[in-house]
Amino acid sequence: MSVHIPTLNSATKIKHYYGFKYLLNSSVHTQIYNKLQLQSTYKMDELKVLDLYPGPSQHSAIFRNIFNPKQYVLMDSRPDFVKFIQDNFAGTSMELYQRDPYEWSSYTDMIEKEKRFVPNRQSRDKIHNQFLVMANLTGMIGEGLFMQWLSCIGNKNWLQRFGRVKMLVWVPEATAHKVLARPGSLIRAKCSVVTEAFTDTKLVATSDSSTLQKFSSSLLEGHDPIIFSTRDTWLNSGKPISLLEVNPIDHDIDLDNWDYVTKHLLILKSTPLHTAIDSLGHGGKQYFSEKVEDKLLMDKCPKDLTNKEFVYLTSIFNNWPFKPDIYMDFIDVFQENE
């Protein structure tokens, strides 16, 4: 039995949006789900969906009606949205878990203590085909929380301990610019290297904002996102939003050394490596100049490096007899996002 889909008219009557923005156009949501071709990944009668900060939940109801997953849980604790969800979905298969998605304990309580939502574990040789995470991180805390989630993918913890769990995440367009920045981009930073290292992330949809051109033409051509009107979001004012499809990839990166190398070099992201490399430790320039096989690599700036090149430099760093104690390093990993 289908569930009621909240209308634009009813959703815009919610008094507080708590600084978040939501796409409220059922036709565009349907286009998005068609584009994602989720049936090729998931066994729908076995799929469990965890929807974080669902807000007015129009997208949630549409997903439920199209795919009819085994379980659909909405996690939200914001009072006006909680009331709206209860008014619209009481007595349906849509389950509300009234906790804050920001808190780590919300997940441990839900999964381990209360057993309200218990995903199975799968091997990391493919995307988990019975567990999907959806989220809206367009509010003030969104970018920082998204960076934490990317780190969790790399560390294979949080919800990613169950396998390679796909995430469909709404973020501010500016955040999408940052995490999708390619080597050579002026805004290339640690967050985009993390995204490249641990995920295959695609731009699924974005608004027709005046800043759309900040995405590279090659990215727009390759990802072919759905472009929707800024009028289809509520609230209409403020910064535009984008939808990212985050597919975790399996990796065997030496995380501690890789983290040290990438964050130190990217502080000097526009400085050629032959100079910036000394930031890894005293004597670094001489050591790396001797060990790096492709001497042209040392002429590159950190912002121009691919993750593969960072991994290569990390392997050299790891074999350095006089490398510094990386555990005595106190540089903030997200310093470039502040």
From Swiss-Prot:
Its main location: mitochondrion. One of its GO terms (molecular function) is methyltransferase activity. S-adenosyl-L-methionine binds at L23, D76, D100, N136. It is an enzyme of class 2 (transferase). It comes from the Eukaryota. Keywords: DNA-binding, Methyltransferase, Mitochondrion, RNA-binding, S-adenosyl-L-methionine, Transcription, Transcription regulation, Transferase. One of its GO terms (cellular component) is mitochondrial DNA-directed RNA polymerase complex. GO terms for biological process: methylation; transcription initiation at mitochondrial promoter. Gene3D superfamilies: Ribosomal RNA adenine dimethylase-like, domain 2, Vaccinia Virus protein VP39. It holds the Pfam family RrnaAD. InterPro entries: KsgA/Erm, Mtf1, rRNA_Ade_diMease-like_C, SAM-dependent_MTases_sf. The keyword Transcription applies. Its EC number is 2.1.1.-. It is found in: Mitochondrion. Belongs to the class I-like SAM-binding methyltransferase superfamily. rRNA adenine N(6)-methyltransferase family. Mitochondrial transcription factor that confers selective promoter recognition on the core subunit of the yeast mitochondrial RNA polymerase. Interacts with DNA in a non-specific manner. This is Mitochondrial transcription factor 1.
